[in-house]
Swiss-Prot record:
Disulphide linkage map: none
Major location (coarse): nucleus
Organism: Aspergillus oryzae (strain ATCC 42149 / RIB 40) (Yellow koji mold)
Protein name from the UniProt record: Pre-rRNA-processing protein esf2
GO biological process, one term: small-subunit processome assembly
Function statement: Involved in the small subunit (SSU) processome assembly and function, and in the 18S rRNA synthesis. Required for the early cleavages at sites A0, A1 and A2.
Compartment list: Nucleus, Nucleolus
Length: 335
């Protein structure tokens, strides 16, 4: 092993000021790193060589002892290095076969079935039933369960339009349940929708005798050629119209409020001006500028200039009309 010629622990450590004066040099830093790694590599190689020498000496002693004891023993087995090399070869062969298997699996999975372009797309075979009136306070989930209990299913979609209370109606305080005016129910098949509309139309809801909806009557109609997309378009159109009307009404109300507030502000300004004028007059009267006599408020008298009314032809006399003709002729000669 190599011996250190100098003790690093007893040497003086470089000061920070010196490093700061030198600055940071990337090349110098890389060279120092390479030098340190080379030093570590040489130290590890020396340690390994020492250990190998010791192992070789010990193995020679063991061989001598085994030979002195007797030569009638079995031949020495294969060294561990040979066994390890054989195992490595087997692992390489198995890994090669596995790699081949993986490629085969990938090729099999990559082969996909071509799409059937000849088949037409599936038709929408759903049917829609319209309910013109609904029992009061009937919820969509309850309506769906009622129809499915009578084996009219499966039901895919339900839409109920809520009732809009007029502005003049009294405000409800206690009852918060919603009421619906009409609704649409979509069935998975047209056949079920037609059968439901034919059997339940103009019949009582039924169910439990003391139930809430027992005596109400179904009002159903199958909508031929009507799909759920058409309904959504209609509902969206109605909603947009309702929102547009509401926006127009809101704009009109805002405009009226703005005009009213402007009138109130102008009225306040005029009242303030009148009050100030009265206060000025009072101060003048108190100071004696008016000679101690109270002057009455001067009433404003407005004068208007009225345009002269021209006489029509039916009001003009014959002499005046002839004179006008003469004057016109004379003036025409002069000018």
């Amino acid at each position: 092993m190599t011996t250190r010629k100098r003790n690093e622990f007893l040497d003086l450590a470089p000061s920070d000021d010196e490093d700061n004066d030198r600055g940071y040099d990337s090349e110098a830093a890389e060279e120092s790193k390479a030098r340190i790694s080379k030093r570590r590599r040489t130290q590890t190689q020396d340690d390994e060589s020492d250990q190998s020498d010791n192992d070789s000496v010990a193995s020679d002693e063991d061989l001598k002892l085994s030979k002195s004891k007797g030569k009638a023993k079995k031949p020495q087995q294969r060294s561990e290095e040979d066994v390890i090399s054989d195992n490595d070869d087997e692992q390489q062969e198995t890994s090669g076969t596995q790699y081949l298997d993986v490629t085969e699996q990938e090729t099999k999975s990559s082969k996909r079935k071509p799409l059937d372009k000849g088949k037409p797309p599936k038709k929408n075979k759903t049917g829609v039933v319209y309910l013109s009136s609904l029992p009061p306070y009937l919820k969509p989930f309850a309506l769906k369960s009622m129809l499915e209990a009578r084996s009219f299913g499966p039901i895919t979609k339900v839409f109920l339009s809520p009732s809009v209370r007029p502005a003049s109606a009294p405000r409800r305080r206690s009852n918060k349940r919603k009421t619906y005016t009409d609704g649409w129910v979509e069935f998975a098949s047209k056949k079920t929708a037609k059968l439901c509309a034919e059997t339940l139309n103009a019949s009582i809801v039924g169910g439990r005798k003391g139930g809430w909806y027992h005596d109400d009557v179904w009002n159903m109609k199958y909508l031929k050629g009507f799909k759920w997309g058409d309904l959504m378009e209609q509902v969206q159109r109605e909603r947009q119209e309702r929102e547009a009307k509401q926006r127009i009404e809101d704009a009109r109300a805002r405009k009226e409020d703005k005009v009213f507030l402007q009138g109130v502000e102008t009225g306040k300004v005029l009242d303030g001006m009148q009050r100030k004028n009265e206060e000025k007059k009072k101060r003048k009267m108190e100071s004696g500028d008016a000679g101690g006599q109270q002057t009455e408020e001067l009433k404003v008298r407005r004068t208007f200039k009225q345009n002269e009314v021209k006489k029509g032809r039916h009001t003009i006399k014959d002499g005046e009309a002839a004179l006008e003709d003469d004057t016109k002729r004379v003036l025409g000669k002069i000018f």
